[in-house]
């Protein structure tokens, strides 16, 4: 058995161990669509030519940001939509934090390959490059 085969076998047999995980239920596609509709409504309410920002309560930015711009309501897009343990995939919303993703996937013996240092970084933020450390 090769080292890689050995590792694959050990990973397949591994059982998740609780640390501070709080298992959460995925929100589902209907709730996701409600969040998308809420976001679209807030976008359509922004006057033409105005700059926009994400209106959210928390941030992992380590610089100030202007509150003068119109805010897009992303409050309905912060969850895990669905976990498929057979395909080993998860559908998530853009404002989903890595903390919530791990809490939703660990009960299935899954987790992301990479988790940023700040567990409240959103997947959307990490994908756009904000979660990458230099």
Predicted regions and their residues:
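Noncatalytic alpha-helical scaffold of FAD-dependent oxidoreductases
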Residues: 1-134
């Amino acid at each position: 058995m090769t080292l890689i085969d050995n590792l694959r076998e050990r990973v397949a047999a591994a059982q998740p161990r609780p640390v501070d995980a709080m298992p959460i239920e995925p929100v589902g596609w209907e709730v996701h669509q409600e969040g998308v509709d809420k976001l679209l409504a807030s976008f359509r309410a922004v006057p033409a030519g105005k700059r926009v920002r994400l209106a959210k309560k928390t941030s992992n930015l380590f610089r100030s940001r202007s509150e003068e711009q119109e805010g897009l309501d992303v409050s309905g897009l912060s969850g895990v939509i669905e976990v498929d343990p057979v395909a080993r995939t998860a559908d998530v919303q853009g404002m989903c934090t890595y903390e919530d993703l791990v809490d939703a996937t660990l009960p299935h013996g899954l987790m992301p390959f990479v988790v940023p240092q700040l567990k409240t970084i959103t997947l959307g933020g990490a994908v756009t490059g904000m979660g990458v450390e230099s």
